Amino acid sequence: MKKIILLLLLIACISCQKKEIVDILVVNANVYTVNDTFENAEAFAVKDGKFVEIGNSNNLKLKFKADTIINAQGKTIVPGFIDAHCHFLGLGLNQLNVDLTGTTSFDEVVNRVTDFQNKRQQAFIYGRGWDQNDWDIKEFPNNALLNSLFPNTPVVLERVDGHAILANQAALDLGNVTANSKIDGGEVVLKSGKPTGVLIDKAESLVMQHWPKPTKKELVAALLEAQNICLNYGLTTVDDAGLNQNEIEIIDSLQQAGILNIRVYAMVSATKQNLDYYLNKGIIKTNNLNVRSFKFYADGALGSRGAMLRKPYTDKPGHLGLLVNSIDNLKETAKRIANSAYQMNTHAIGDSANHAVLNTYKKVLQGKPNRRWRVEHAQIVSPEDFKLFQDIVPSIQPTHATSDMYWAEDRVGPKRIKGGYAYKDLLNAYGKVALGTDFPVEEVSPFYTFYAAVARQDLKGYPEKGFQTENALSRKETLKGMTIWAAYSNFEEDEKGSIETGKFADFIILDKDIMTVDVSEIPNIKVVQTFIGGISY
């Protein structure tokens, strides 16, 4: 009898124990924690914006009392997605201008510009998103039609990758661009000895340095619009690849005011002015902003034949591409950054550019371990250069492979294409890959990224057997690349990228299990809820 009484008293004491108060308790979920062992869980508790404990539903319900209880009803939860390379501000600014993405002909481009101007009546017309590779006539356009339609209004239409523009005569006149105009790292495209209006890479600056800069009001509107788009796709951190001081300061002020809630890893544009300022100031780190890297350009893009190759383009004999910055500039900039705590994140697409960047990194980083310098894109890499990624983070964008696969071999030929978009080879070299989209060059959707990485097909299932599937990633590798490995590439793996105790409660609820759903369904997955720091957006 005494034993029974003692047992009842013990049970009563346990039941009377005061539960720990938390803000959120999520139960009955299919949680991919993406921790070191890639454990699954079904519940977790959140307090003060961070994960408190992860485990099973019954145990956590016994231990915690929450202001908000979320019954996930078996839905899948993953860490918030991190886009390791995008143009967040650029996405927002695009919403204020002519959207030319998805156009299938130059006539459609012109029609969109005309419709836009009829509604907006702008003094300067700017658009972005055309790609001649998507047209029946896969050649650069000329500005003749724009000249006739807009004789007095400057028009600049930027190619989807940002590495070429089409400018009408009124815009060319702003920079006094003629057939004799020259600029290192750029090209003024001529036909019959006259400018066509197409300016490639640094030649864009001949016009754009005279173009009106966005106002602070426009920048704020753009950032908030971009945030709305990204949150709907489950992005909780964005790595913006190329920002100036005033733009970073606006981002910081909006975050401090609680208006901009998405977290931003800022790659500072590596201009002399920015280098001087930030190298002197040092790394800037808040919970929402991380300013610790410089974005440098080595070459242009493959689609506009500006990517720098070691041997001429297969479809343009004698042409090697463009070095946007000289090798001397690359080396000098790398030395400056190496003497600081900052990372250097360099755009390199062609095999020549990748070779130069990797060897420069190797030289200046001798005796400086764990600097996590990055190569952005790493699209065409010579076989002997993959080993140089042993200490360099490959920051890659899987949808580039499925967007470029239709014509990439035309550019570089059947031999070089084997070192193209070689994501598995890059993963094997470094042990991690940081995955992004490069939006607005590509679509924002991280589910397109995931699908492109694992299926190596376009949204119509082409090619049937996938594009160079020996370089496909597994679903586990892909999810890591969009979460913990992306966080690692930002020096943020201790605070985000996985669902673990002490980390920011950045997580998303999905309508389908991204790890088991039929691969063809991955692009159609929807985000049910996005949480940043335990707050639903």
Put a short name on every predicted segment.
Residues 17-27, 32, 36-277, 296-353, ...:
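Divalent metal-binding segments
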Residues 527-537:
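Short peripheral tails and domain-boundary helices/loops at the edges of structured domains
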